[in-house]
Curated annotation (Swiss-Prot):
GO cellular-component term (any): cytosol
NCBIfam families recorded: glu_cys_lig_rel, PRK02471.1
Domain ATP-grasp: 489-747
Protein name as annotated: Glutathione biosynthesis bifunctional protein GshAB
Role: Synthesizes glutathione from L-glutamate and L-cysteine via gamma-L-glutamyl-L-cysteine.
Membership in a protein family: In the N-terminal section; belongs to the glutamate--cysteine ligase type 1 family. Type 2 subfamily.
Residues the record lists as binding Mg(2+) 2: E717, N719
Pfam families: ATP-grasp_6 (PF18419), GARS_A (PF01071), Glu_cys_ligase (PF04262)
Residues reported in the UniProt entry to bind ATP: 516-574
Length: 750
């Protein structure tokens, strides 16, 4: 079977970049007040380690392992890792942060508690590692990079090879990649090594100078020297590994800490028949200059590097070559961070192969830029990660830098707690739900990002969610009924719930003729089936014919049918009902500022806009307050300008409408709202058959309990997909977390 020079013989349109990616990040939890390894147990907020697909513990209780799902491209893998890191950083105790370096801070054996896992084998395995290698070495952290070649790519190469058996071909291809990785991994150690020092008493021998990567040297986490596994063929590899376990040299196959692992089966013998499906590359130190420990550019450069390894011919003396390459890697790992690659390192072979891959397959200029960056780092070691890290070392210690950098990333995680890193372009309620999904260990897939459509599953239990709370729990007809204001009104009227008096019109002339019945009454004119307050005109006293006619025309521009209803005096509240229980109540107040007798209105607006919850284009729970034409007209009607200095305590209205989208305030009144109104809202949602419902009630005096006789509350609208984030992150009040309750209802077994 011919494996070498397959890429050279491939056509330029081969899907060479097609691959699947997975990243694993290890990080220690650090107790900020003491700046030592945290002694607290694994956070209960992170669900159960028995099944959590994204957040586990590695060797010790404080060492988190963050695991991305399989990603179809490198960008998605980085996106996953950003989100999982964000969730982990905000789920640990608030006085803890994740250590950004591979080498731990000062730590003693007694500070390291073995992960308290329920699986007896996993716990006993860690006890064995303690006896065999010691606890301290287990506290080193890193990044594991998983890559599987794309199926179309594998099929094309298989056909080109004219091999007889697809699994044998796939195994040989992955074995070649593994062999060449072990021959050339020293370049990655040079570029990305980031463990230059160990803190006091960590190593048995003392280092006099910083090095490039302790973790990737013989001083790092490696097997004992008597462990020898051949890479000559897959069969030799399997036999040697099985014999090492049988002889007691290894307690299990996974104790073999090779820089590259064959993956796809739990037992290595299965690879012979079922095939290797991907490889795990374990040589990456945490990059402390990235909040997630690795950068997009690194992931893509490594991908190009791996393709170059397929371009390079195999070795005819692989075990001997790997032995020599290991010595070279150790030399580079223990060299000074500003020392260039040694002369015996065949770096030109790698650079030429990477260049050939770029040219042969017409890769985008992005990959050429990545290669140029590699070339610059080869010429200038100070540009490598270890080279940049060198100036951060103080007295052969990185503790101060690690503490500072870890705190920066901790603060960054909490900077916008309503957003999920990596998914900021999605609707806020969906981001909040995804945070909870990752935190609790529910598997997820974004089926359609534009449509906010998610697939969630745990074991065989699958749920589909749209826009954060539209699920199978609601009958299909329910949102259709609530989207139609006339249908909603009729259903509520039949159940004797209070709704505004009014009528529906599909003809402009008929709507105009209705004026005689309402000309002396306060009214609201609105489209029949619209949202976000579009096309609505409010007349708090009464309307003249000209104004009424204009309001009709505005409403008809939004819908083919309109409603003319009585205007109800009072305060509007949004009630959030979930499965018959009102769990949140919100008061929305129009954009405003309150005078302090010192600042102008313009300055007061700027001060209020400093609230981190305020932003633009619905990317934050609250919108920035503008001072445009509408707001300035409103000020003029009150006798103010933007330069006026209102007296202390004077409330200045900047808008009439209370929409959050136009700078309004959200005020959580859940705990103070009279329970009779909560019950009323819940009963209205139940009457509609709604699992999730936003109920808008006008209440003249919320301090008085609701009475059916007095009907001192009126429902003006029901919403089938109510926003959730505005209940959680409010201008005032404690806020109510809704998405965790949605998730708990969907997956009660968790």
């Amino acid at each position: 079977m011919i494996i070498d020079r397959l890429l050279q013989r491939s056509h330029s349109h081969l899907p060479i970049l097609q691959a699947t990616f997975g990243l694993e990040r290890e990080s220690l939890r650090i107790h900020q007040p003491t700046q030592r390894v945290a002694q607290t147990p694994h956070p209960k907020t992170l669900g159960s380690r028995n099944y959590h697909p994204y957040i586990q513990t590695d060797y010790s209780e404080p060492q988190l392992e963050l695991i991305t799902p399989i990603a179809k491209d490198s960008q998605e893998a980085i996106r996953f890792l950003k989100a999982i890191s964000d969730v982990a950083g905000r789920s640990i105790n608030h006085d803890e942060y994740l250590w950004p370096l591979s080498m731990p801070p000062k730590v003693r054996e007694e500070d390291i508690q073995i992960a308290q896992l329920e699986d007896a084998f996993e716990y006993d395995y860690r006890k064995y590692l303690e006896k065999t290698y010691g606890k301290l070495i287990q506290s080193i952290s890193g990044i594991h990079y998983n890559l599987g070649l794309g199926q179309e790519l594998l099929t094309s190469l298989f056909e080109l090879s004219q091999a007889d058996n697809a699994i044998d071909f796939q195994n040989q291809l992955y074995m070649k990649l593994s062999q060449n990785f072990l021959r050339y991994r020293w370049l990655l150690t040079y570029l990305y090594g980031a463990s230059p020092v160990a803190e006091e008493d960590f190593l048995d021998q003392k280092l006099n100078n910083p090095v490039r990567s302790l973790r990737n040297s013989h001083l790092g986490y490696v097997n004992h020297k008597d462990i020898r596994i051949s890479y000559t063929s897959l069969k030799d590899y399997v036999n040697d590994l099985e014999n090492a376990v049988k002889s007691g040299q290894l307690i299990a196959e996974k104790e073999f800490y090779s820089p590259v692992r064959l993956r796809g089966s739990k037992a290595c013998r299965n690879y012979l028949e079922k095939g290797i499906t991907y490889l795990e590359f374990r040589t990456f130190d945490l990059n402390p200059f990235s909040p997630i420990g690795i950068t997009q550019e690194t992931v893509d450069t490594v991908h190009l590097f791996l393709l170059a390894l397929l371009w390079i011919d195999s070795s005819s003396h692989i075990d001997q070559d790997i032995k020599e390459a290991n010595r070279l890697n150790d030399l580079i790992a223990l060299s000074h961070p500003l020392e260039k690659l040694p002369n015996q390192a065949p770096v030109s072979d790698l650079v030429d192969a990477m260049q050939s891959v770029i040219q042969h397959f017409n890769l985008s200029p992005y990959y050429q830029d990545l290669l140029e960056s590699v070339k610059r780092q080869i010429q200038s070691p100070e540009l490598t990660v270890a080279g940049q890290l060198l100036e951060m070392i103080e007295g052969l210690s990185l503790e101060t830098f690690g503490q500072r950098q870890g705190q920066i990333y901790h603060d960054y995680a909490w900077e916008a707690p309503y957003a999920l890193k990596g998914y900021e372009t999605m609707e806020l309620s969906t981001q909040l739900l995804l945070f909870d999904v990752i935190q609790k260990g529910v598997n997820f897939e974004v089926l359609d990002e534009q449509d906010q459509f998610l697939k969630l599953w745990h074991n065989s239990h699958i749920e589909y969610v749209k826009n954060g709370n539209m699920t199978s729990k609601d009958n299909y007809i329910v949102p259709l009924a609530m989207a139609n204001k006339v249908v909603t009104k009729k259903i509520l009227d039949e159940k004797h719930f209070p709704t505004p008096f009014g009528d529906e019109f599909t003809d402009r002339k008929e709507a105009l003729n209705y004026f005689s019945q309402i000309q002396d009454k306060p009214i609201v004119v609105k489209p029949k089936s619209t949202n976000f307050g579009l096309g609505i005109s409010i007349f708090k006293t009464s309307a003249n014919l000209a104004s009424y006619e204009k309001a009709i025309d505005i409403a008809f521009t939004e819908d083919s049918a309109i409603l003319v209803e009585e205007y109800i005096e009072g305060t509007e509240y949004r009630f959030f009902v979930l499965e018959g229980d009102c769990i949140a109540v919100l008061l929305r107040v129009a954009a405003n500022v309150v005078g302090d007798g010192i600042h102008t209105i313009s300055q007061l607006v700027k001060l209020k806009n400093q609230n981190p919850l305020r932003g633009y284009d619905h990317r934050s729970p609250l919108e920035v307050i503008e001072l445009g034409e509408v707001e300035q007209l409103m000020l003029e009607q009150q006798g103010y300008t933007v330069n006026s200095i209102p007296p202390e305590g004077t409330k200045i209205e900047l808008r009439r409408n209370s929409n959050i989208s136009t700078g309004g305030d959200s005020i959580d009144v859940t705990n103070t709202m009279d329970p009779t109104y909560k019950q009323l809202a819940a009963e209205m949602a139940e009457a509609m058959g709604a699992w999730v419902c936003g109920v808008d009630l006008i209440i003249p005096n919320a301090t008085q309990a609701y009475s059916k006789d007095k009907k001192n509350a009126t429902c003006i609208e029901l919403n089938f997909n109510p926003l959730m984030y505005m209940h959680t992150y409010c201008q005032e009040g404690p806020g109510q977390s809704i998405t965790p309750r949605i998730l708990a209802k969907l997956f009660p077994e968790l």
